[in-house]
Each structure stands twice: as C-alpha cells, then as structure tokens.
Amino acid sequence: MDEHYDVIVLGTGLKECIISGLLSVDGKKVLHMDRNGYYGGESASLNMNQLWEKSHGKEKKAPETLGSSRDYNVDLIPKFILSSGLLVKMLLHTDVTRYLDFKVVDGSYVYSSGKINKVPSTDTEALTSSLVGLLDKLPLRKFFIFVQNYEENNPATHDGLNLKITTMDALFKKYGLRENIVDFIGHALALYLDDSYLQQPAHDTIMRMKLYADSLARYSKSPYIYPLYGLGELPQAFARLSAIYGGTYMLNKPIENIVFDEEKKIIKVTSEGETVTCDKIVCDPSYFPNKVQKKGKIIRSICILNGPIPSADKKFESLQIIIPQKQVKRQSDMYVGVMSSAHCVCPKGKYIAIVSATVETNEPEKELAPAYALLGPIQEKFVYISDFIEPIADGTADNVFISKSYDATSHFETTCEDVMDMYKRITGKDLVLTVHPNILKQQEEAGNQEQEEQ
Amino acid sequence: MNNNNKIFQFKLVLLGEAAVGKSSLVLRFVRGHFLDYQESTIGAAFLAQTVCLNDTTVKFEIWDTAGQERYHTLAPMYYRGAQAAIVVYDIRSEDSFERAIKWVKELQRQGSPNIVIALAGNKLDLAAKRKVETAEAQQYAEENGLLFMETSAKTSQNVNELFVEIAKKLPKTPTTRPGSGRVAIAPIDNGNTGKKNKCCN
C-alpha cells in the first residue's frame, strides 16, 4: 500500500462517491477509503436490523410485526430526484444510469390550510386546482404562461423587465399574486426552503420553476424519480464507476493520522499502520472536525406505517408533501416523503414516511406535529437529529476539500451544486455535464464490438 | 429479429477471489479470445452476450467486479437483482474455493430468492497443479443446488457450455425483475445513446 495517489477520498457518502467517480474517469489515480464496513456513510439505506440497532442498541430485536429485515432499505437522508435535475445529468454524464433502476414517484402535494393538495404546475392545472381560489386563477394562469415562455437570452419574453435585477417579490406583485399562491410557488414549485428568495433577482426562481415543470413533463405523474432499493444505491453505483476507471476501494479503514508535508507538497495518510501519500484529499466533514463548523440542526423522523397515508390518494405508492413554512408558522419548510414496496424499500403492505425539517426550537420533535397529523397511525418511529456542517475554508490553501453535510431540502440540487463546486476547486475546471468523452469512447467500443458480432 | 424467438434478458454477476479468471471467462465467452496476462479489470466492466436455446434467446447482461473484490469491497448493489451468478475459483487454490463457498452463502442470504448460481472451477488447463478435487466441488454444488463445471478460459473448455446451462435453468417468465413500471433515464437534449437491438443469427 506504499503508494502515491493523485487524490485520496475519505468517506463513501454520495458526494464523495460522485467526485471519486468523476476524478477516476478523468484519469486521476484515486484511493477511496471509509472507516465503516459498508458504503454510503450518511447516505446509506439501512435494513430493519441496522436501523433498529442504531436507535435501540443491540440487545432488543426489532419486533416481528415489522416484517423481514432484509426487505427494508430505509434512507437516513430522504430526498427525491428531480427528473430533469442535476443528479440525472450527472448520472447520464457518467453512464451510471445503467447500474440503477428508477421509478417515478406517484404524487407531489403541498400543504395548505390544514390539508394537502396536489401541486398545480401548469396553466391548465392552475384553473382546475382546488388550491387556487377563484380570484387567483386568472393571475396565476397568466404568470405560468409568462414563466413557460421565458427564455433567458430572448428579451422579448421578459415582459419589459430586467429579471436579473427585478426581485421575485416585485414580479409576484406585478402579477397580482396573493400570499397563499406566492407561498406554494416559492416552496412547492421553486422548492425554496425559506423566503429569502423573494428579495433575490427573479431569474433564479423562474429557472427553478422551469426545472420543476420540465421534470414533471418527463414522466407526467410527478417531477420526481427514485431508485429501486433506496438512495443508498446511488453512492454504490458511483463507487463502481470509480472502480471501473481504476479507483481502489477499501472499507473498514480507520484513519489514524493525516500529516501535511509542506516541503514536498504532499499529504501523508495513515490507516492501520500503513502510510500512503497524495496531492489532494476529498472527504466528508467527519474526517476533519477541526476544519469544519456547525450551521444548525436537521431533524429527520422515519415512520413505519401499516398502510397508505389517509390524507393522500390511497392508490399512490410514493409521494411527497411539502409543508410551506408560513402554513405552520415556521421560518423554514417541512417535508414528508412516503415510499413503499413499489420501490423495494420495505415489505409489501408497509409504508415508510420520512419527515424532515430544519430544527427551529428546543423541542424539535414537537415541530413535526403537523406532519405527523397527516400520516395516520404510526407503527414505529425512528427520530434522528443531526448537525448541518460546513467546511471553514474552500480547500484551495491546504488541498483538503470537504463536502457540506446533506441539507434539509427534499431533492438533490444543492447536493449536486456542492459536488460541482468542489469539482471546480479540486481540478480548477468546470464540470461540463454532457456525456464524458472517456465514457463516449467506451460506449463506442462496446457498440463496435456488438456490430462485429453481428 | 426475423425469427419468432422470444428474447429474455438477465443480469449475471461474476464473483470470486481476485485472479481466479473471472474476466477471462467473460472475455472468452463474449469475445472469444484469451490473454495470458489479462490486466486487472479496468474500463469495460459491463458486457452483453446472447445464448440461443431452441425456442428462446437469452441475453446476458454481464457484470464484472471492476476489481472491487480485491479488498472485499464489492457493494451489495453489484449482485442486487441479479438472476444469475457465476462463482469462480481456481482449481489450484483451496483458498479460492473457500472464498467461493463464502460467496455462495452471501448470495443465498442477500441475493434474489430464485437466483441461479453456477460454481466454476477455472484454469482446468492447469489441472496438473490441481488442489481442489472435482468430486469435492461437485458434491458441494449438488448439496447446495448449484450448477457446476470445471472450465478453462484459456482453452475455452466448458465456457460456452457453462453459460448455456445457466441459460437453460433460468425461468423464462415475462417479468424477471421486481418493481414493474421502471422508467428509462435518457438524455434530455439529443437522445442518441446508440443502443442497438440484436439477436443471434
């Protein structure tokens, strides 16, 4: 193991695995280690025994009424994939889609006045949705048509405004949209966690609305897709990509020491008495407690249910509910993701609802009450509170590139933005999300091979 | 596709210790060649080949380990949903046979319930240095309901036969993977992935 690597990656969470894969495909020599004996770190999906042990320790076994442990693949960090979003672009860029199977999420809901409604996102839906009051229908329809037609580089579609300057708040006012409508546009379509976007230029929000609409248009039921067997498949798939392009994988590797050799400009990493060197380290925040800072807490509550949730369409085997902050007098949104055996994450008949939110009070679980009220009887509950951690420095000075922990958003856009930003800091170049030339080369070779055989 | 053959596609994974000849077996089967010094698996770890039976065509989507077996870091995703597995050992190495048995147990515990497992004692061309007796492996395979063959990727002995036996044993039912309603993730802009349908002639 006495070797030099371009990059050593520590931790096999999703972000680390995507970066490891991208760097290996680029031809970098990568060593990827994890102190745990399994892939995924915080982004792993657990079976019931693992989940139970995490909350209750080893002594007590999970009750048999929960069903077979191995039928469970429970995400610790619940998120859905926007089907036209950045993660899909990264999956295509690397051809990692071939290792995974996805299904569409059945429904997307937003909470309003104590009940949940399907999210209207097109001009026609705006007219029929019960969420939209009679007086709001016409202005909303006009606004949706404006957004649909908006093209960044075509001023004729900008309604005479400079939307890189005009705030979203001003744009909403121009269209005469009232608070309830603004609330669902900002939080259920543009997917903002809080209201700070209102004072930002309108362009970004419009692009996020278009992303939602594009994603919805792909598979029509909802804008989200989700992999069979849980999100824990994603880091494993990117790790496989990295391995295929020469990355070396080692699990169960505790890191004992990391020394910076200023003179030779290398970093020495020691694990189990063996030392390897590298130019750069990429890792999750847990590997450098002295180089990161806490920025708030996130609560995630995993609820096992014995049937579909009573507040939504009973036929739906998977869905998302967004609870906008103002609806429940909070400063940030709350999310509920519901999954079932349709995505191979639990036994038949069971449903998993995961509620997540940024912690705002000293009694975080009480904050989740409005979400719990939507779920019906809960058979078993696993509640976790975790810190949101960010690196203090950007890594360019010490060559240690640390990812941010996974935030409370319901999708992977911020996750991928962090990955793209890290990639740029690590390599000095932008990540271009078209299919990678090295992947194309391999695809072509495989194609030629098939033709020869014919 | 001018015959009326039904085509069934299956995911097949290779398992076994490093350097027992997993990649060589696949390359012999898919490309019909053998390299004395096959490099550790890099780059192409996803191959396809078809086997024609009487009235059906079986297309194998073959997953190689990408070297992740070296430090025992193969991810569960690798054999997830696999309908067939070839567990390979080197007939000159008892350790590799022990490791193969561990893989069989892992597949029985974590793999798909109806997975077809084949045990392959590879490097039959080097039988002079044999350490694992045919009868011993045969008996283990029978007791555990595995297909069993000794193979040589170098001489091609029993390689096609092994895949044909697996193809015969696989259930030919329309939905072979869990979770109906899966969606294809295709590029958003100019959707040309260059995937071609093919069948044997």
UniProtKB/Swiss-Prot annotation, chain B:
Gene3D superfamilies cross-referenced by the UniProt entry: P-loop containing nucleotide triphosphate hydrolases
Spans traversing the lipid bilayer: none
Membrane topology, record value: Lipid-anchor
PROSITE patterns with a match to the protein in the record: RAB
Keywords: Cell membrane, Endosome, GTP-binding, Lipoprotein, Membrane, Nucleotide-binding, Prenylation, Protein transport, Transport
Pfam families: Ras
Regulation: Regulated by guanine nucleotide exchange factors (GEFs) which promote the exchange of bound GDP for free GTP.
SMART domains per record: RAB, RAN, RAS, RHO
Example GO biological process: intracellular protein transport
Motif Effector region, residue range(s) on this chain: 38-46
Compartments, record wording: Cell membrane; Endosome membrane
CDD domains the record matches: Rab5_related (cd01860)
Ligand binding (GTP): 16-24, 35-41, 64-68, 122-125, 152-154
InterPro entries given in the database record: P-loop_NTPase, Small_GTP-bd, Small_GTPase
UniProt keyword Repressor, yes or no: no
A GO molecular-function annotation: GTPase activity
Role of this protein: Required for the fusion of plasma membranes and early endosomes.
Protein name: Ras-related protein Rab-5A
Species whose genome carries this gene: Dictyostelium discoideum (Social amoeba)
Primary gene name: rab5A
